[in-house]
Amino acid sequence: EFTLFGETIRPIISDINVGLLFVLSVGAIGMYGPLLAGMSSNNKYSLLGAARAVSQLLSFEVVSGLSILAPIMIVGSLSLVDINNYQGDSVFDWLIFSQPVAFLLFLIAGFAETNRTPFDLLEHEAEIVSGYITEYSGLKWGMFFIGEYANMFSISFIISIVFFGGFNSIGFIPGGIAILLKVAFFIF
């Protein structure tokens, strides 16, 4: 909850008890995009790039799934609201302080899943054959990068909610602005 112009706002559409598992599983479906793009382009280099992309995405999904288990075991719930409320008392209750190794593993896996440096080998722009998007240009090429940036936002929100207190206010900064600042920090 946060207050905006005197009104208390609860920015929750639905509080499902397996919310974090649902978000991670929907994110894992994203590996079908590169696989189907490489297969449907009818190019052997795109198919090899798709196989490379799927193997990298699958390997880092395992790391991100296992690293998120430590905060889940501390909180005792998969609900994103419960994880947020667990860290609500002060900044020192954030799970980054009790689980720094899990945070680093999840951060590295998040960088790898979103193709950020140094894990941008899947469609590196300096290569002539740029992975599974070799045959795509224009709007289709742009849709892959819109999806990549949407994945960056979702990973940043997960990191902010699970490890950095979520929607809880930081001192004089209200909760809604605080989470946007945290997400912006991890995106840039």
Q: What are the functions of these language-model segments?
A:
Residues 1-188:
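Selective transmembrane helix interface/packing segments
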